[in-house]
Amino acid sequence: MTVEMRLDAHPRTETGRGAMRRLRRARRVPGVVYGAGKEPQPVALENDQLYRLLEEEAFFSTILKVQMGSETEQAIVKDLQRHPFKPLVQHIDLQRVREDQPITVHVPLHVHGEEQSPGVKKGGVLHHDLLDLEVVCLPKDLPPFIDVDVSSLKVGQAVHISELTLPEGVQSAALQQGEEYDAPVVSVQATRKTRGASSDDEAESSESE
């Protein structure tokens, strides 16, 4: 179930480094709301509210309700800059969305079935090649996450983008560019333990012959 997320944004007129510093001292985050055929609108957001939402995994793959005065805009996060060591957001870009226009969003991947994987049972290590997947879809079709089943993976095998089961109306941005972009999503890699077990199996097979 997708959780509705709301952001309070205050239109601002001041720009420049000095104005940005004053905003940040007041624990506000400078940002901009743009797109959907409208003029870009500089805004200021509350850092504490924004940081609480950042704790939600689906924050970057959710249609946000951005409240600006009496108006509500629907938007997605296109860029966010964090302070290198303080719990502060330095800047945020929000792109307006329209119900009839496709959007491109990074959606988190949920991997399951590791305990059942034959490769993991033999000592292989599950390697996450991708943590999220860039997808293209209409706003109404945007999923909060995408499932990745690794329960049948053996050592040396991988699940590729083309093998994922995407919801109806959702496409991989990479595969739209061509089959050569069909990257591995997750794989089971060999370790010394699995390589040793493989050698022992081969030796036993030779002796039995």
UniProtKB/Swiss-Prot annotation:
GO biological process terms on file: translation
Keyword GTP-binding: no
Keywords recorded for this protein, A-Z: Ribonucleoprotein, Ribosomal protein, RNA-binding, rRNA-binding
Entry-linked InterPro entries: Rbsml_bL25/Gln-tRNA_synth_N (IPR020056), Ribosomal_bL25/Gln-tRNA_synth (IPR011035), Ribosomal_bL25_b-dom (IPR020057), Ribosomal_bL25_C (IPR037121), Ribosomal_bL25_long (IPR001021), Ribosomal_L25_dom (IPR029751), Ribosomal_uL5_bac-type (IPR020930)
SUPFAM superfamilies: Ribosomal protein L25-like (SSF50715)
Residue ranges, annotated region (Disordered): 175-209
UniProt feature, compositional bias: Acidic residues: 199-209
Any one GO molecular function term: 5S rRNA binding
Pfam families, alphabetized: Ribosomal_L25p, Ribosomal_TL5_C
Record function comment: This is one of the proteins that binds to the 5S RNA in the ribosome where it forms part of the central protuberance.
Recorded family membership: Belongs to the bacterial ribosomal protein bL25 family. CTC subfamily.
Protein name (Swiss-Prot/TrEMBL): Large ribosomal subunit protein bL25
Gene encoding the protein: rplY
